[in-house]
């Protein structure tokens, strides 16, 4: 997020030991001070008094009212750290946290430094114009779009009255927040939970809906996973009821020592408890926190429970692992329970003994681990922290249960530590920092608990002990010694891909920290990183701010000049230096830079492009622009500046059409490229997508209130849209395209007591509709494309192959279907979008891979219409999305390589990369 700078304040640099913030008047880091403050006041009051007394430095005009205490912690006998939450006119500011560090000794207290983000340019009004119900509905719809546009058999309607959970998701409003963009954007925070259509994967999204227009301005997944491997789709499986919290622990537990075998074969001594009432022994450590909070470290039997039942909730009837004696046998070993329990104890001890932290929350809170979790009864090889507990998958043929490796358990539990301290937002650079810190401490705990030397070749590997047959290097999920740097490794992606690169880019930062640990040793390095996380970092820090936090923490801990140089050298070696984002190169021509938009695509036709853009700091609602594909001339504004979000435009070179998000409706608007009046073509209370235009005929799809999708079209003579499916409750149509007065779309329709998928072509001149031939029975259909000769579409006929997709084509009469690219042959794509010209078709596609990396990101591939040739459109390093075909082989798209989203173009494919 970028901020509005205040020129008058920015001209005053402040003290030499203050590091200026980016586009804000408040410094992000102040160190090297010892300024007296009231020793008798509460820590939070003393901290705010210091900020108020130094307005010329901090530029915080109302510290007493605009900064609300979040937490005050003491370290050792003298150090105090206070975290303060910024509020704007009483509304919390996302990422607005400021930290004040103090020392108190001999009846005196001094401030030693500050850090964080306070946004000085906020001026937005905090009165919403959108109702909470509208915000929730649009958040759920936005999440459904994020999860994929394909029309899937799993979306088949069940009843005419509608299923309230037809989308598989529900939203819960969590109140208003201010997004710190420019003058600020007032938004509803909505948490969307449920399961992904088609796959059933767990969904927990945080969606921030603009409270004036109702547009989803920010969105990311809140599930902090160990990795993001592809999982096969599964059929429906009945779930057990769920509860909001864990069952009550038995009373009068007696601490005992037990034993069990780890999955590695090593014997483990286990801290357990005897339950006198049941006469059995539990994997409940009642000893570690017995003298303080009396909380438990508990390991729960979640075998037979699906991941969707455990994400953000507790399966009803779940119990702790138990045994009739102190020896826990094969069931506890094979499920990963022994490993989870032993490893959780190691993590607790590491934080307690080495860093003085009592449990994940720092206050002796309970630690809960669920093991044996499946993917709807199928193997599940992942693990995650859901905000309250650790959840470990049962594994699969190659991967053991995910609790089998100490670094995985350390990683997930460290997410809990971060959530209770820096609380780094799990998206973009701050999310990559979250992952990097979890990896660093996970590995630090692993090598400490298992006695692995730092010089061991496996010391920097994450998850290397999870595999049953693969060697450590081949098994590892990540490698902190992979040499990743910002200049050669940073991958620009949208929040729709890996939450903005939280795993993709994490080893750039974790690698620097690991280098530092190798050179300084664990005793000092771990303290430096921990101090940086708990006392310096704040929720939306990026790599540069985090570098400053680590350097400041090293200095505060008394690191020598030589040791501080080691820290600097470690970051420099990984390219983490101020301004590193400017050093990334591309092989494309930029038509329109730094769009700062979310979930808004691109249109092209007749030699023109159209796209939406916000202002430089992303605070303004989007406007629609149009320009020439040859780059000549300046882009022109097409949409009005009326407070609505103008998004997802399309053009044929004569007319631009787009959607406008307002407080009560989503409107379809149009305007000639040459200028003229803006027309409102249609208003929807639910939502519109997939706009296309040709000679003033517009085609789109509309969502209904129960999650259904219906394709409609408007000809110049039509007073209202004609819906191809009549908006029947039992028929869905989606993903339209238009060419030569014909439209094509995917269709899900009832037949012989079941549902079938097909692609239908309608001749708008005659009204005749034909269903194209199907070469196999698809379970999912993707985007259609049509030109003057053929119709093309994406098809998936095998839901067990990880999303591999075929490209199918047929004649406009529905006959002569053939496979352009097969999902069953080597080199098959995982395709998500398609655009066609007369000469070529271009896909957004991923190639199957076992881990996230540049090669497996969404990239543009261009195929000849007969499939005889396939080439990469661009070798840019980063995500490529929303392609729109120009003439011949020309393509324009949104490219995220540089870390911002740019509209770029190529006249022909790059070929082989």
Predicted regions and their residues:
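Segments that shape or occlude catalytic/ligand-binding pockets
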Residues: 7-236, 242, 365-385, 757
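Extracellular zinc-dependent metalloprotease catalytic-domain scaffold
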Residues: 168-173, 177-181, 189-204, 211, ...
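Beta/coil-rich, acidic/histidine-enriched accessory regions frequently appended to metallopeptidases
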Residues: 543-623, 630-635, 639-647, 676-678
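Multi-bladed beta-propeller domains
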Residues: 582-595, 630-643, 673-687, 716-732, ...
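Repeated scaffold domains used in trafficking and secretory/extracellular systems
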Residues: 591-604, 641-653, 684-696, 728-740, ...
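Residue position within the beta-strands of beta-propeller blades
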Residues: 607-614, 656-659, 698-702, 743-747, ...
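Structural motif
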Residues: 615-627, 663-672, 701-715, 747-761, ...
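Blade-level signature of beta-propeller repeat domains, shared across WD40, Kelch, NHL, RCC1
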Residues: 868-913
């Amino acid at each position: 997020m970028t901020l509005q700078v205040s020129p008058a304040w920015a001209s005053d640099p402040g003290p030499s030991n203050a590091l200026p913030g980016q586009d804000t008047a408040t410094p992000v880091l102040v160190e090297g001070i010892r300024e007296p403050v009231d020793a008798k006041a509460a820590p939070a009051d003393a901290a705010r008094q210091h900020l108020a007394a130094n307005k010329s430095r901090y530029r915080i005009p109302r510290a007493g009212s605009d900064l609300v205490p979040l937490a005050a912690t003491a370290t050792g006998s003298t150090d105090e750290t206070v975290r303060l939450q910024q509020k704007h006119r009483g509304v919390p500011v996302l990422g607005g946290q400021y930290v004040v560090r103090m020392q108190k000794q001999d009846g005196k207290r001094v401030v030693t430094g500050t850090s964080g983000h306070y946004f000085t340019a906020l001026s937005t009004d905090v009165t919403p114009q959108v109702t909470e119900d509208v915000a929730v509905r649009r958040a759920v719809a936005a999440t459904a779009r994020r999860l994929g546009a394909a029309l899937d058999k799993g979306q088949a309607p069940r009843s005419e009255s509608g299923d309230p959970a037809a989308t598989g998701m529900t939203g819960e409003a969590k109140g208003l927040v201010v997004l710190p963009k420019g003058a600020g954007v007032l938004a509803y925070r909505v948490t969307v939970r449920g399961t992904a259509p088609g796959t059933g994967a767990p969904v927990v999204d945080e969606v921030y809906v603009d409270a004036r227009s109702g547009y989803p301005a920010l969105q990311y997944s809140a599930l902090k996973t160990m990795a993001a491997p592809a999982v096969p789709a599964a059929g429906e499986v009945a779930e057990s009821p769920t509860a909001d919290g864990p069952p009550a622990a038995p009373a009068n537990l007696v601490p005992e020592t037990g034993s069990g075998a780890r999955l590695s074969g090593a014997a483990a001594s286990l801290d357990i408890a005897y339950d006198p009432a049941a006469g059995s022994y539990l994997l409940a450590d009642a000893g570690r926190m017995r003298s303080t909070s009396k909380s438990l470290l508990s390991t729960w039997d979640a075998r037979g429970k699906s991941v969707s039942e455990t994400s953000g909730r507790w399966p009803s009837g779940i119990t702790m692992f138990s045994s009739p004696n102190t020896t826990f046998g094969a069931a506890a070993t094979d499920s990963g329970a022994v490993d989870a329990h032993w490893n959780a104890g190691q993590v607790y001890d590491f934080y307690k003994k080495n860093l003085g932290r009592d449990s994940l929350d720092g206050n002796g809170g309970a630690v809960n681990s669920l093991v044996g979790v499946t993917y709807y009864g199928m193997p599940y090889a992942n693990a995650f922290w859901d905000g309250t507990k650790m959840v470990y998958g049962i594994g699969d043929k190659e991967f053991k249960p995910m609790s089998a490796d100490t670094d995985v358990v350390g990683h997930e539990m460290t997410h809990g530590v971060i959530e209770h301290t820096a609380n780094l937002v799990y998206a973009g650079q701050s999310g990559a920092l979250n992952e990097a810190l979890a990896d660093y401490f996970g590995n630090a705990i692993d090598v400490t608990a298992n006695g692995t030397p730092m010089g061991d070749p496996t010391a920097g590997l994450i998850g290397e002990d999870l595999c049953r047959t693969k060697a450590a290097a081949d098994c590892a999920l990540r490698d902190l010694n992979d040499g990743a740097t910002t200049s050669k490794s940073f991958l620009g992606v949208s929040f729709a891909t890996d939450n903005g690169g939280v795993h993709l880019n994490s080893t750039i930062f974790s690698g620097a920290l690991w280098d530092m640990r190798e050179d300084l040793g664990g005793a000092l390095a771990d303290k430096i990183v921990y101090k940086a996380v708990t006392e310096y970092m704040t929720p939306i820090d990026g790599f540069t701010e985090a570098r400053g936090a680590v350097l400041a923490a090293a200095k505060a801990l008394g690191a020598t000049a030589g040791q501080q140089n080691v820290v600097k050298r470690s970051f420099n070696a990984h390219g983490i230096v101020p301004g590193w984002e400017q050093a990334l190169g591309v092989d494309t021509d930029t038509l329109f830079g730094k769009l700062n938009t979310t979930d808004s695509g691109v249109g092209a036709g007749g030699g023109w492009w159209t796209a939406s853009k916000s202002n430089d700091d992303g605070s303004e609602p989007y406007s629609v622009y149009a320009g020439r594909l040859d780059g000549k001339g300046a882009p022109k504004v097409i949409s009005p500046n009326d407070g609505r979000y103008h998004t997802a435009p399309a053009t044929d070179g004569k007319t631009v059409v787009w959607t406008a998000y307002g407080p009560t409706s989503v409107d379809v608007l149009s305007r000639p490229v040459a200028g003229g009046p803006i027309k409102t073509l249609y208003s929807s209370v639910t939502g519109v997508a997939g706009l296309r235009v040709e000679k003033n005929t517009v085609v789109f799809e509309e969502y209904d209130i129960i999650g259904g999708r219906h394709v409609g079209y408007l000809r110049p003579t039509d007073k209202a849209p004609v819906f191809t499916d009549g908006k029947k409750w039992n028929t869905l149509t989606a993903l339209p395209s238009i060419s030569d007065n014909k439209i094509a779309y995917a269709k899900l329709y009832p037949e012989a007591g079941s549902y079938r998928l097909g692609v239908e072509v309608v001749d708008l001149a005659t009204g005749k509709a034909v269903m194209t031939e199907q070469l196999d029975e698809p379970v999912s259909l993707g985007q259609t494309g049509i030109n003057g000769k053929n119709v093309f579409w994406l098809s998936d006929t095998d839901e067990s192959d990880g999303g591999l997709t075929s490209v199918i084509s047929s004649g406009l009469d529905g006959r002569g279907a053939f496979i352009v690219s097969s999902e069953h042959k080597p080199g098959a794509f995982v395709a998500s979008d398609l655009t066609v010209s007369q000469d070529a078709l271009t896909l957004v596609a991923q190639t199957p891979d076992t881990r996230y990396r540049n090669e497996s990101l969404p990239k543009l591939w261009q195929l000849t219409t007969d499939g005889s040739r396939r080439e990469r459109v661009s070798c840019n390093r980063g995500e490529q999305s929303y392609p729109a075909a120009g003439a011949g082989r020309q393509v324009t798209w949104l490219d995220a390589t540089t870390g911002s989203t740019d509209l770029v173009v190529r006249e022909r494919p790059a070929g082989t990369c």
